[in-house]
């Protein structure tokens, strides 16, 4: 398993680095160049063009089934799930075949609300310490399951 991170606006990069280093998992931080490189043998900094969705396309093109993707981008999550990849949002919520349809519908509904009312800005919920804790719990669970499944029997 590798971990692909839609890194430009990801608030949990340090947490991902800690868990990945402890478990010796390769992490690919994919961004359009707006990040300071992390010097860690388990972290690869992938810089893509500034074209719209270039990082998303790179992740989908390079990821494989059972790799993990960290993103808040619902469209990217949907494309990764279709390839058999695992997806976690930075708040720890797992996205999968069972719930991605609801997430896509909510995204479309919110987009329609913004289009109909330019003063509607959405919930604006800030990223909290609880979100970070929930993310770490979810990431540790995925890594633990991966480690159990990759052991020789």
Question: Which stretches of residues belong to each language-model region?
Answer:
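Nuclease catalytic cores that cleave nucleic-acid phosphodiester bonds
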Residues: 2-153
